[in-house]
Amino acid sequence: MNILDKESGITKLISQSQVNESEKDWHHTVLSDVGFRLDHIDFPCVFSKRAFKKKLIKFIFVENVEASGIQHLAEGLKDYVELSKNWNGDLNTAYPLIVAFSLEAINAQSVSDYHSFGWEVLQKLHEIDPEPWSEGVSTDPNSPAWCMCFDGMQLFCNMSSPANKFRRSRNLGKHFIMVINPRERFDIVAGNTPDGRKIRTNIRNRIDKYDEIPRSLQLGTYGTEALEWQQYGLLDENVKREDKCPFMFKKK
């Protein structure tokens, strides 16, 4: 899908192949950094590795987080949701989304700084979401039944930052990146079935091998005691989480 912003001429949602045609140097840097990591034989997420190899990844590049930048992201995300509806279960049509932010869009030094920025973005998206919160999904981040929703779709938002030094699987290069997938897709490919549990175990064993520290204490599956919001932004150390989710649900 190739959606053009008529005012700026910038493509909102672009394919992996189209990134090479971009006139923005930082877009090429993002693609190169992501590719360098996903091409590593030990990178834990086998689905991301496969998607990159097959050029299935979609991209949204965000220049700023002012109103114009958030609107640009929201419109691209709406296109991604439309693309992802009625998925047929074929991994060849499972398109992960990488949302990359320019270095000028963010002033952060620590993992917590980057996470705060990520939650600010998700909050702003929620506040301009054109659709009601997804039915059956809790509006309380401290509920196991909560996840981020936008345009009527449940989403999982993986925050990756250059400040993640030990948790290498959450560092995709110089830029802050959100890797977004429809949450319910995980129920299909890695759900609570014998095959799904085997896939999750394999990926988490790969995390232990790839990262400089053991897998996060907060990892889990949706609907269990593990909270989704804590898994969006994993700390660079294994400690009990005492912080609160900054996301606040707003009634329409």
Give each language-model segment a name.
Residues V111-G118, R170-F176:
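"Short basic amphipathic alpha-helical interaction patches in structured regions
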Residues L91-Y95, V99-N107, P162, R183-R185:
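Short, flexible beta-strand-to-coil junctions
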Residues A163-N205:
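Compact mixed alphabeta submodule
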Residues G136-K174:
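Aromatic/basic-lined ligand-recognition segments
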Residues M1-N92, I106, S116-P132, A190-K252:
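Non-catalytic accessory regions used for complex assembly or targeting
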Residues S102, D151, N158-S160, N181-R183, ...:
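Structured loops at beta-to-helix junctions and adjacent beta-edge loops in soluble globular domains
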Residues E63, A67, V99-S112, S143:
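Short, charged/polar micro-motifs that form catalytic or ligand-binding hotspots
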Residues I60-E63, G118, N158-S160, V179-N181:
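Active-site ExK catalytic segment of metal-dependent nucleases
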